[in-house]
Swiss-Prot record:
Pathway: Protein modification; lipoprotein biosynthesis (signal peptide cleavage)
InterPro entries per record: Peptidase_A8
Name of the protein in its database record: Lipoprotein signal peptidase
Annotated signal peptide: none
Purpose of the protein: This protein specifically catalyzes the removal of signal peptides from prolipoproteins.
Major subcellular location class: membrane
Encoding gene, per UniProt annotation: lspA
Membrane topology, from the record: Multi-pass membrane protein
NCBIfam families associated with the record: lspA (TIGR00077)
Length: 168
C-alpha cells in the first residue's frame, strides 16, 4: 500500500484543484461570455452534458455516470497491474483517475460538466475543456510514453539463452 501513497495523494490533489477552479469559474465567470487572457487563450464558462466533445450526451446522467465509474474501475485495474518501477505510467494513471473523478463529481452534483478553457484564433477554436480533461489527456500521454520507452528497456533479469540455434 505504501508504494501507492504518492499516487493516491496525486489523485486527491487533482480532484481538489479541479473542483476549486470550477467553483471559482462558477461563482466568478459569466456564463458563455469570453474573457480573453492572451490572444489565443480565453476563459469561457459552458456546460458539457456529454463526455469529451459532448459525445454520448444522449445517454443521460445515469448512463454517463455508469460509463465514468466503469472507466475509473478499468484504469484502477490497469494501474494495479503496473510494476512499481513504472513511475511515469503510475503517475499517468493517477492523473486519469483524478480527472475522471473530478468530472464525475460535476456530473453527479450538477448533471453536467463545467468547462471553461478555450484555445482559439480569429478563425478557429478548439473544444472548450477543463482542468480535469487536461489531467486525463496528460495522464494518457504519460501512459503511452511509458509504454514507448518500455520497448527500449532491457529486462534486468534476462539471461542469454543457452539454447543452440537450429540448423534449419
Amino acid at each position: 500500500m505504501r508504494s501507492w501513497s504518492p499516487y493516491a495523494l496525486l489523485v486527491v490533489a487533482a480532484i481538489a484543484l479541479d473542483q476549486w477552479i470550477k467553483h471559482l469559474v462558477e461563482t466568478g465567470l459569466p456564463f458563455q461570455e469570453k474573457l480573453d487572457l492572451v490572444p489565443f487563450l480565453a476563459l469561457f464558462r459552458t456546460y458539457n452534458t456529454g463526455i469529451a466533445f459532448s459525445m454520448f450526451s444522449s445517454f443521460g446522467d445515469t448512463g454517463l455516470v455508469v460509463i465514468a465509474v466503469l472507466v475509473v474501475a478499468f484504469v484502477l485495474y490497469l494501474a494495479t497491474r503496473t510494476p512499481s518501477g513504472h513511475v511515469i505510467a503510475r503517475t499517468g494513471f493517477a492523473l486519469i483517475i483524478g480527472g475522471a473523478l473530478g468530472n464525475l463529481i460535476d456530473r453527479a452534483v450538477y448533471g453536467h460538466v463545467i468547462d471553461y478553457i478555450l484555445f482559439h484564433t480569429p478563425v478557429w477554436s478548439f473544444a472548450i475543456f477543463n482542468l480535469a480533461d487536461a489531467f486525463i489527456s496528460v495522464g494518457a500521454a504519460l501512459v503511452v510514453f511509458d509504454e514507448l520507452i518500455g520497448w527500449r528497456r532491457e529486462p534486468s533479469n534476462a539471461k542469454p539463452s543457452k539454447a543452440k540455434p537450429s540448423k534449419d
